[in-house]
Amino acid sequence: MKQAVIVDCIRTPMGRSKAGVFRNVRAETLSAELMKGLLLRNPQLDPNTIEDVIWGCVQQTLEQGFNIARNASLLAGIPKTAGAVTVNRLCGSSMEAIHQAARAIMTGMGDTFIIGGVEHMGHVPMNHGVDFHPGLANNVAKASGMMGLTAEMLGKLHGITREQQDAFAVRSHQRAHAATVEGRFAKEIYGIEGHDANGALIKVLHDEVIRPETSMESLAALRPVFDPANGTVTAGTSSALSDGASAMLVMEESKARALGLPIRARIRSMAVAGCDAAIMGYGPVPATQKALARAGITVNDLDVIELNEAFAAQSLPCVKDLGLLDVVDEKINLNGGAIALGHPLGCSGARISTTLINLMEHKDATLGLATMCIGLGQGIATVFERV
């Protein structure tokens, strides 16, 4: 079976969704700039050999509709002979794009893919046009479509306190800020034009969403936002609303080597799994267990882990049940996570994978895991290996 590898991976800075730096930049533009960036950074690659562009996006309407993968690839000037498809596994969409490209390579259905994802949550909100079938209530709890309430449920089931959530959120902002100041995001961020508060055109080079001033005291002052009477989940312990895109060049290993392109990581194993929609945030646990089994390793073999921080109340139960509580500060989300950087839905899977690969290089690590929960009760996971 052929081997799929990551040759390159980049992302936009994460822009604040409310009046942020990308308020006048469309989702197709964010996507196209990254596609062009991958080609500029890897001139040995002939664009005419691209098999397919696979792009994750959740809200496929308005500027993100009518197959944004194709719209963005045409905008980027990718040869018209390349295919393009937009995929939707909700929060796991761009990780699903990684998996689809890897499976195609493994089965000989192409050797060069551009994958990634985007979500402009300022232009197309998460709940835009959502209309759940009334009959779903026969099979799942009514609140299962309300992500914040599923986090409340999962946190209660696992005894996660308000203070634990606040501490996890503070850690996310502190680590993301430190990564910015120390230049650890520089290799993964691809600068994109945006606009400052006065409307002037600027080159955006840093994430806009991080709040380095976040403290236990400031978070303690916030009221629960999803269950005001009895809840513990606040806006401060939830993933920030942000706009962004991420992209990867995924190739068959021998083809990449023949072109003299770098092999930044191999895709060692992949998995998806389902769980109860009422505790959708638990999905990373069964997905990770599957991926580890397929890789023939245990959780203790992992050097670095990126767990998407949809909510602190969701992340902590996953950390606990994966047996990782004692190694959080050594292995998990070392550059912060979505609480600080935001969770542009279709972007996040490739974004956390990009951050993971850069962290693995920084730490000279061998094995890494990227995993995330998915609305309505799923999880997705990928094990990467540096060679």
UniProtKB/Swiss-Prot annotation:
Reaction(s) this enzyme catalyzes, per UniProt: an acyl-CoA + acetyl-CoA = a 3-oxoacyl-CoA + CoA
Any one Gene Ontology molecular-function term assigned to this protein's record: acetyl-CoA C-acyltransferase activity
PROSITE patterns: THIOLASE_1, THIOLASE_2, THIOLASE_3
Gene Ontology biological process terms in this record: fatty acid beta-oxidation; phenylacetate catabolic process
Active site, renumbered: 91 (acyl-thioester intermediate), 343 (proton acceptor), 373 (proton acceptor)
UniProt EC number: 2.3.1.16
Pathway: Lipid metabolism; fatty acid beta-oxidation
GO cellular component: cytoplasm
EC main group: transferase
InterPro entries named in the record: FadA, Thiolase, Thiolase-like, Thiolase-like_sf_Thiolase, Thiolase_acyl_enz_int_AS, Thiolase_AS, Thiolase_C, Thiolase_CS
Chief site of localization: cytoplasm
Subcellular location: Cytoplasm
Protein keywords: Acyltransferase, Cytoplasm, Fatty acid metabolism, Lipid degradation, Lipid metabolism, Transferase
Listed PANTHER family: 3-KETOACYL-COA THIOLASE FADA, 3-KETOACYL-COA THIOLASE, PEROXISOMAL
Summary of subunit composition and partner proteins: Heterotetramer of two alpha chains (FadB) and two beta chains (FadA).
Family indicated by similarity: Belongs to the thiolase-like superfamily. Thiolase family.
Described purpose of this protein according to its UniProt entry: Catalyzes the final step of fatty acid oxidation in which acetyl-CoA is released and the CoA ester of a fatty acid two carbons shorter is formed.
Protein name: 3-ketoacyl-CoA thiolase
